[in-house]
Amino acid sequence: MPLLSGKGNKFKVDPPKIRIEKVTIERPAPPKPKPKPAARPSLSSSARSSPARRLSPKASSGSALSSASSRAKSSSPYPSSADERRLDLQRKRKALSASQRRSPASDRIEFDKDSDAEDDGWMDLDSHKRQRKATSESKSVDSNRKLKSAKAFERKDERLQFIHAVDVASLEHKCVPIMGASKEDVAIELQYPTLQRREKFELVWGKDKIDAVEASIRIVRLVAETYLTDAEAEPFTNQNNGFIRRLEKASNRNIQDLMGFKAALREYNETLLALVEDGVVSKNLDNLHDLPPHLAAFILDQIYDRTVAPKVELLSKYENGTDYVYGELLHPFITKLLVEQTKMTSDQVFVDLGSGVGNVVLQAALEIGCESWGCEMMENACNLAEAQEKEFHARCLLWGLEPGEVHLERGDFRKNSSIHDALKRADVVLVNNKAFTSQLNEDLIRMFLDLKSGCKIISLKSFVADSKSSHNINDVGSTILEVEECTYPEGYVSWTNAGGQYYISTRK
């Protein structure tokens, strides 16, 4: 009974509470703020166009750059009412966040998931620039390193021979057209940041073949971030109508705008050539003393894809348990070893004992600019190394870069007099001795007696006996070497995805 009487009392109080409904009835007022964002589009639109206005009076390329920029603006393919709606949406987005500093990707039109991936590319562009700045600040710059190849900017070498992408990935190689192209429309050409010939590609797809679309976009991005100042790169990197953005948009799987892609690439070629002819790129290279690791890796991959990859089966014919086992240390590992840990400079000497197809020898010559030696005794690997070296010199000229001297020797390094002479001058020696027999490792220790004091030896097996072993009393390695054990992470070697140990020994 008390509960019932209590309930009755509550019913008498409730009715006035229900009348609070009045508040919800009078809430049509909030729509009034809608006009506020509409007042900002003119502000964001002027902000969007201002970088282009800053560019024309700034760049040393003068009229060539300003005219190229205007060409890029006037060539947006297929204008339509849908484009106007998208631009209106973009202006509204910018208005909503005008008071905040935005990331390069924040104002972009979203088409689908692929567009999100494209925006990741823009983030990559900025991250590479930040990485390059951070790298240059964290390491000592080799002021003696001269990156520029003067020959690349003097005149076009009509006799320059290199392997075009079309020579390994084309309709003739049973690839199929992409982006809805007919067989007559697949051909494209790409300008490098020098006066040299353009590379020929075909817009085709084939398993394990060069991807012309991806390669084109990466090359444009690398040129913009390495060879040009921010102002000079504006026609390339502009978020709305830059060459990179237009190429990514046109190649989007849901758009597949062949003519738009080719138009953007054609304008990129013309704009870059104008900058090269006006001396802008050459001047910028004069001010650089170190090569970004990701650019070096890309160039080396270009070489490998055109020389080794088509014949890679030749490297699988060697037996485990012998000194004739093939394996590669990958680009990030070599950068860590030569740039970060041993801090090599362009006036030093590098030697790779068992150099395979020459990957590390070429990377040292390109990324460090040092004198670089290698010796290999497997015939197939030697043949591929020679092919890589030939393409290496041509590619360096295309990119306008001057590498260090490259010397690739054939035969047993224990019996090669040129290698023995190079070892006496060496500052860093690499020995991928993971699969070497114990006899060969013992022979190497005796060779190290001729190394100069302070020379660094990088190996995957230690040349010093275990300190717990009773056999280290007369061990030559422990007498002449001080050893540091290190660990490399996943993805640093070709034969396994797992990490492992390596050793840096210093000649006493």
Describe each region flagged by the PLM.
Residues 342-343, 369, 400:
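Glycine-centered helix-boundary capping/hinge motifs
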Residues 346-356:
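Conserved class I S-adenosyl-L-methionine
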Residues 358-362:
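Glycine-rich SAM-binding Motif I of class I
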Residues 365-366:
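Gly/Ala-rich phosphate-binding loop of Rossmann-like dinucleotide-binding domains
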Residues 371-376:
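Conserved SAM-binding motif I beta-strand of class I
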Residues 381-508:
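Domain-level detector for long C-terminal conserved domains
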